[in-house]
Amino acid sequence: MITPLHRNILARHKSSLNGALRVLPFRSRALGVSRNVFVYEPPNMRNLSDMHLLYLFRGHEREFVYIDEDDSRSTTTIEDLDALISSGQIPPVMAVIPGLTSIDGKRHSMGINSLLPSADTRDGLGSGQFWDFLTLDLIPYVEARYQSKLSGGFRLAAGFSLGGYTTALIATAFPGYLDHAGIYDGLFMFDAQTDIRTNAPDEIWLKSAVPDAALGPAETRSPEALAPWNPAELVRYADPVTMEEIQETMFWIRSAAGDGLEGNHDRCKYFTALLREHGITAGFNRIPLHPDARHTWHWNDRFIKLFLLNVFTG
């Protein structure tokens, strides 16, 4: 259902974009419910013969396009993308922004097939099979609908925080699809859910309430149950054929300046080192985006611009 907030977001972007922002009500067979997906179309898309495709992942579909998602930003991610295209700094890029949370944004699927499916389809999570929603429903639909314009373009994904985790999962569990994966302050898993800083069980993935909707309550979780959804383990234990496919994706990872309550620097550093250990290209050498970088939308939006400029002009 398109809400007043969706309409307000569309109204803002109608006057601020040279391209167009639309809401696609998408019926998912995997979820058994409809999900709203924001789609950004670059300027003059009807007359384009070729363009690139960018998926944006975080939580609720509004987050990349809602100016008041926090108090740090003066433009939205899509306004920044539109400006880069309109100024000729990057070629035309279409963006697809699926929601990964409940309708109220409070319960996060993380983009996986839930270990604890929702019992109430009214919350928007449906069956909880979000991995199937992404890889069996949404991606094939987008590829088929825009096939004539996407034939020669890059496939990109970018994610912030938990969306960074989802981006890494697409790149490692759906290997070979993405050409580039951009991740800002990603909430990465450690191998076997053991925090390398403390040699103790991971406080986020095994003990916190953050992943409850997808993983169930903390007392039911185990490293073994999470292994199929752990990008670190998918990299470390990949067979040779799968590793070659993962190596087709170039990763671009930066973090906030701090860790703990201030960001995910250590997790980003860990995952970048793991990629390089296995011959997977990581495009940035320095992990913190800036000495003042924070876990906010302003800094994520700065990262997205840097990521795209490096992909297309670096």
Regions found by a protein language model. Give the residues of each.
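Non-catalytic cap/lid and distal C-terminal segments of serine-dependent acyl enzymes
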Residues: 1-314
